[in-house]
């Protein structure tokens, strides 16, 4: 059986200034519960918990997870 992934960590590194990282809650009402703004080169390590079901990244950033790495892009 697979292990509990509720405590997985995500590393997010801003490529440009103004990257928004937003934590979304679990439950019948999905809400924002935390927001951070990163400048170029800043890194945040986020964790999925019993309260955090999703993390939204807006802007140019590299996102590393246990599943691999992906790069987000800013709107053009």
From Swiss-Prot:
<dbReference type="GO" id="GO:0003723">
    <property type="term" value="F:RNA binding"/>
</dbReference>
<dbReference type="GO" id="GO:0006355">
    <property type="term" value="P:regulation of DNA-templated transcription"/>
</dbReference>
<dbReference type="InterPro" id="IPR016031">
    <property type="entry name" value="Trp_RNA-bd_attenuator-like_dom"/>
</dbReference>
<dbReference type="InterPro" id="IPR023558">
    <property type="entry name" value="Trp_RNA-bd_attenuator_dom"/>
</dbReference>
<keyword id="KW-0804">Transcription</keyword>
<comment type="function">
    <text>Required for transcription attenuation control in the Trp operon. This trans-acting factor seems to recognize a 10 bases nucleotide sequence in the Trp leader transcript causing transcription termination. Binds the leader RNA only in presence of L-tryptophan.</text>
</comment>
<comment type="subunit">
    <text>Oligomer of 11 identical subunits arranged in doughnut-like structure.</text>
</comment>
<keyword id="KW-0694">RNA-binding</keyword>
<comment type="similarity">
    <text>Belongs to the MtrB family.</text>
</comment>
<dbReference type="GO" id="GO:0006353">
    <property type="term" value="P:DNA-templated transcription termination"/>
</dbReference>
<keyword id="KW-0805">Transcription regulation</keyword>
<dbReference type="InterPro" id="IPR000824">
    <property type="entry name" value="MtrB"/>
</dbReference>
<dbReference type="Pfam" id="PF02081">
    <property type="entry name" value="TrpBP"/>
</dbReference>
<protein>
    <recommendedName>
        <fullName>Transcription attenuation protein MtrB</fullName>
    </recommendedName>
</protein>
């Amino acid at each position: 059986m697979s292990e509990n992934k509720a405590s997985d960590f995500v590393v997010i590194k801003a490529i440009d200034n103004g990257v928004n990282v937003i934590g979304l809650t679990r439950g019948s009402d999905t809400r924002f519960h935390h927001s951070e703004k990163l400048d170029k080169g800043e890194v945040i390590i986020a964790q999925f918990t019993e309260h955090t079901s999703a993390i939204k990244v807006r802007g140019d950033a590299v996102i590393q997870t246990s599943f691999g790495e992906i790069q987000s892009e800013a709107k053009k």
